[in-house]
Amino acid sequence: MIKKLFLLVRSLVILSIMLYLGNLIAYYIPSGVPGSIWGLLLLFLGLTTRVIHLNWIYLGASLLIRFMAVLFVPVSVGIIKYSDLLIEQINILLVPNIVSTCVTLLVIGFLGHYLYQMQSFTHKRKKVIKRRENQVKQAN
């Protein structure tokens, strides 16, 4: 019981430190990127470089994910509270969202097509090289 409590506190402390560091970066680098996103990037870098082990944050992260719906209730209430303002500004909000979605889909589509062709080309090139090596061996 005490060990599980220690693991939970440790994971929440690590997640809180990442959030704090992200907010610190957002304060000193005014790029418009929120501190929570910077914190997620720091957490991602820590996990990929294995500075932070997954089992260190697993318990706290799973607890937060379990109650994620409850954490989004204030956002939903804010949307309902200011729905008249959102309806007034629908053109300003809707057009950029549609354009950015279309641009994202196009970029992902072209990138996926390009990467698929590169993989296919690499496979074909390896087959040609192997065939030429076999022809050289047979000629000798």
Curated annotation (Swiss-Prot):
Transmembrane segments: 1-21, 33-52, 60-80, 92-112
Record's keyword annotation contains Repeat: no
One term under GO cellular component: plasma membrane
Keywords of the record: Cell inner membrane, Cell membrane, Membrane, Transmembrane, Transmembrane helix
Keyword Cell inner membrane carried by entry: yes
Protein family according to the UniProt entry: Belongs to the UPF0299 family.
Protein's name in the database: UPF0299 membrane protein HI_1297
Record organism: Haemophilus influenzae (strain ATCC 51907 / DSM 11121 / KW20 / Rd)
